[in-house]
């Protein structure tokens, strides 16, 4: 499962169609089941797409996101963001 708990999921995949790692952040209007270990539905999703030949960068990005989401203040701020402009500005500062 890519559900990591506390309403957060980090689905990740390596694909041949890209040459740089991409991270997408989704703040869902309605939480969904990601089979998280704590059984909580997910409302915050970080999607990682990495090139097939880029194992180290893929793991580094996954590790970085994992570190950020351990910070309760960071997660609380994410949940308070109301629109795409606020999300963009938030990640521009982080």
Question: Can you annotate each of these PLM segments?
Answer:
Residues 1-94:
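Cytosolic covalent-transfer regions centered on His/Cys nucleophiles
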């Amino acid at each position: 499962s890519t559900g990591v708990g506390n309403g957060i999921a980090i689905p990740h995949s390596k694909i041949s169609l890209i040459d740089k790692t991409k991270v997408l952040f989704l703040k869902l209007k309605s939480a969904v089941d990601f089979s998280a270990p704590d059984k909580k539905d997910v409302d915050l999703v970080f999607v990682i797409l990495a090139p097939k030949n880029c194992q180290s960068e893929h793991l580094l990005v996954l590790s970085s996101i994992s570190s950020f989401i351990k910070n309760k203040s960071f997660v609380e701020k994410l949940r308070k963001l109301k629109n795409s402009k606020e999300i963009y500005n938030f990640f521009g500062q982080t």
